[in-house]
Amino acid sequence: MLNLDLVRDPNTPFRVLALGAHCDDIEIGCGATLLHLLERHPNLCFDWVVFTSNAVRAREAEAAAERFLRGAKEKRVAIKQFRNGYFPDQWAAIKDDFEALKRDVNPDLILTHHQQDLHQDHRTIAELTWNTFRDHLILEYEIPKYDSDLGSPNFFVPIDAATAQRKARAVVECFASQRDKHWFTEDTFLALMRLRGVQSAAASGFAEAFYARKICAGAPARRIGE
């Protein structure tokens, strides 16, 4: 299996754009990967955008972002107020937000939802990510849930056992408002990372997995529009 280092030069600033429809999506989908990258690279800069929240969940999201991004060289967290569950009907307004984001940031890596996610809010964010950012490395993360939409990802980030435990514990501790959901447990998050670890032959037994639709190796590709 070919090993790729997401951050080419740890001494050069590397900007990550993390996008989540809801307040816990980023942490659930790629929290261990973020912790792993921050342990290895001192020059990570983050733009962290959540598109819907309420007063309680916004406080949880801010605390979670602070916890997960500890050690980042730079971090900017934005928590928005689009109507939960109705993202397809708010397409134009959310698209305007994406266009403003594109003018403000030029990330080296974008982490977003999976395009085949059955949650309509997740799917909208994934579609607008690809619609807006045409010259960037985009990895789509997965969210375990009742809808049974987990697929066969093709990009794996091995995670040591301590980091996997740290991610699972932090998600449950940070988002107390979600603990009444039957699936919102440390065991759920560890189980998915364990399964992806098996599928990628991770030495630790744990990994987070993503969908990588387009990766250009070697010389830079011509920019869209040139």
Segments the model singles out, each with a brief description of its role:
Residues 89, 120, 159-162, 184:
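Short coil/turn linker and secondary-structure boundary residues
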Residues 147-161:
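Phosphate-binding/catalytic loops
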Residues 162-188:
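A charged, well-structured terminal subsegment
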Residues 210-211:
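Short, solvent-exposed loop/turn segments enriched in Ser/Thr/Gly
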